[in-house]
């Protein structure tokens, strides 16, 4: 993507990359003239060649955030479909969407774009060292504490301090009543 911020690392110099910390760093250093900010997992090509144009149009027409796909197709090492999931944004727009997925609420992450003015009230996102950062971010976007059973099981093994730090994030932005959309098309998780 032209003029995008690329943060390169190497195994020799860096032992750990923590996505949420990098997102916070990138957002903190965004140019003041930028209107939109996107983050995309590096292993997600999109079937919709116009995903960027469509996403910007959705933001310009009133969405605060846009998930950059409506369905994710997970591929194994031989590029054979292992399973599929609807995107979280599509699932939240239509709770009757039928799909089979490991996540009852749909895929929470993968790729998002938002208006910088809105994101100023959302960032910094929590540094989630226990994993599943996309899930916690989505809980915040939708202002819900309806934590899935697998996430609750994962959370329960940590101290109350860690639990509280994660649970306060949905509280921080839940009264924003964000207008969240999705971009048409599939992405492929390589």
Q: Language-model segments: which ranges?
A:
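Active-site-proximal specificity loops/subdomain of glycosyltransferases
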Residues: 2-34
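Structural signal for conserved beta-strand scaffold positions within catalytic alpha/beta enzyme cores
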Residues: 7-9, 67, 181-182, 189
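Short, solvent-exposed loop/turn segments at secondary-structure junctions
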Residues: 11-13, 43-45, 71-74, 119, ...
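Short beta-strand-to-loop acidic/aromatic patch adjacent to the donor-nucleotide binding site
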Residues: 34-45
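Short, Asp-centered acidic motifs that coordinate Mg2+ and/or phosphate
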Residues: 36, 64-65, 180
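Residues that flank catalytic or metal-binding motifs in active/ligand-binding sites
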Residues: 40, 108-110, 184
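Conserved catalytic core of nucleotide-sugar-dependent glycosyltransferases
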Residues: 47-143, 158, 163
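C-terminal catalytic/acceptor-binding lobe
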Residues: 128-190
């Amino acid at each position: 993507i032209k003029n995008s911020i690329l943060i390169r690392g190497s195994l020799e110099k860096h032992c750990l990359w923590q996505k949420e910390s990098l997102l916070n760093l990138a957002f903190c250093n965004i140019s003041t003239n930028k209107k939109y900010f996107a983050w995309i997992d590096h292993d997600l090509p999109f079937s919709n060649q116009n995903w960027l144009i469509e996403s910007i149009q959705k933001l310009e027409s009133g969405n605060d955030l846009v998930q950059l796909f409506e369905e994710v197709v997970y591929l194994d090492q031989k590029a054979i479909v292992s399973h599929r999931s609807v995107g979280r944004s599509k699932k939240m727009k239509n709770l009757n969407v039928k799909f089979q997925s490991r996540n009852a609420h749909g895929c929470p992450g993968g790729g998002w774009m938002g208006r910088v003015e809105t994101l100023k009230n959302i960032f910094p996102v929590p540094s989630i060292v226990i994993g599943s950062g996309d899930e916690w971010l989505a809980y915040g976007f939708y202002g819900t504490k309806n934590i899935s059973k697998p996430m609750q099981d994962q959370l329960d093994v940590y101290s109350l301090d860690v639990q509280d730090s994660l649970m306060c994030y949905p509280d921080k932005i839940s009264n924003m009543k964000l207008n969240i959309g999705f971009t048409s098309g599939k992405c492929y998780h390589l």
